[in-house]
Every structure is written in structure tokens, then in C-alpha cells.
Amino acid sequence: MAKFDVVDLDLKKVSEIELSDDVFGTEPNAHLFYEVAKMQQINRRRGTVGVKNTSLVSGGGKKPWKQKGTGRARQGSIRASHWVGGGKAMAPKARDYFYRPPRKVRRGALKSALSLRAQEKTLIILDGFSLDAPKSKQAFEVLTKRLKLQNALVIDDKGNTNLHRSVRNLAKFDVLPPEGLNLEAVLRHSHLVLTSAAAKTLEGALS
């Protein structure tokens, strides 16, 4: 078990928390990052492209002129790919790009990302992050002036609606519930901010 400082919104230590080395203390694995990042990017592809090849373009069934004797190059169809209005050679077709590595790989990538943030000292664990009302200005002041962050991913339970509504409107900050944590979101931000409750939730989910 590794010990982490739990701080308040002014970065003052208020307590300590013990978290599993299996989740927050593993050796970061770059290959797992690659596999899961590839999955997230590939699965965003819609795959709806569709172009007609020679066999799908209407018309062109008749030979435009006889094979020999006209002085012109021989042609078999006015819908060949080199004709205007012809079909596309090797036309792309709609396809499903869905890709999903094994569950062990996906969980391992998240553990590696959390451990990387812990090793780089860019993991902040708060005792709580409550706002009086859903105000983006208030959330921005807390994150930039009190926590001294310019770019961060905040993880807290769904029940904290004021926080979620406040942070989701900020350009360089994102907020997710623990069950929505994903590799791309962690690596895209320079800092990871967890509430102590969210840290325990992640520990339980990934152990």
C-alpha cells in the first residue's frame, strides 16, 4: 500500500490515504497505452464511406464501339474507371472499425496511467471538492488560483452535480465520474485531480 497526502482546496495537507500499489504503484507500460489509445481513436471512426465501383454504376453494359477498325482505343464500357462518370477503381466500402483489446489490457492501461501520474507528482487527492452552486467562474478560480492548475482532469462522483456542471464548461479542464475514467482523458491533461472518495472507488474497481 502506498501513502498519499490528502489536501484541501488550498493545497494544505489534512490527512493521508493508503491506496493499492497494484493500482497506483505499477510500472507504466507504454505498449498498453498504445493498444488502448488505438482502440479509443479507431472506435470513433464512423466507417460510413461508400463509393460505387464499376459494377455498381448504372449503365455501361454495352460496348461503346466495335473492337477494331475505328482508329480509336478499344473500350469495353463507358463506366470504366478512367471514363468521366465511371466507377471508382477499388472503391472504399462502408465497414465497422470496432476494435477492443482484452479487459486485462484495458484495466492495465488505466492502472499504468494512474501510476504514471503518481510517479510524476501530478496526482492531487482532495478531501472534497464542493461548490455552492454550478458556477464555472467559481470552479475556474478554485482550479487556477487555489490549486494552481492550468490543465487538469477532475474525477468525482456523479452526485456532485454542481462540480460537474461547473467544470464541463471550462476549456482546459474536464470532469468525469470514476466509472467514466478513460486513458485518453488522463493522458490529455497534465494533472489528475481525485477526491478521496473517487480514489477509493477507482481502487476498488481496478483491484
UniProtKB/Swiss-Prot annotation:
Disordered as annotated region, ranges: 52-76
The keyword Mitochondrion is assigned to this record: no
Top-level taxon: Bacteria
GO cellular component, one term: ribonucleoprotein complex
Keyword entries, A-Z: Ribonucleoprotein, Ribosomal protein, RNA-binding, rRNA-binding
Signal peptide stretch: none
Pfam families from the UniProt entry: Ribosomal_L4
BP terms from Gene Ontology: translation
Molecular functions (GO terms): rRNA binding; structural constituent of ribosome
Keyword Ribonucleoprotein: yes
Entry-linked HAMAP family: Ribosomal_uL4_B (MF_01328_B)
Complexes and interactors: Part of the 50S ribosomal subunit.
Similarity remark: Belongs to the universal ribosomal protein uL4 family.
Described function: One of the primary rRNA binding proteins, this protein initially binds near the 5'-end of the 23S rRNA. It is important during the early stages of 50S assembly. It makes multiple contacts with different domains of the 23S rRNA in the assembled 50S subunit and ribosome. Forms part of the polypeptide exit tunnel.
Designated name of the protein: Large ribosomal subunit protein uL4
Organism of provenance: Myxococcus xanthus (strain DK1622)
Source organism phylogeny: Bacteria, Pseudomonadati, Myxococcota, Myxococcia, Myxococcales
Name of the gene encoding the protein in the UniProt record: rplD
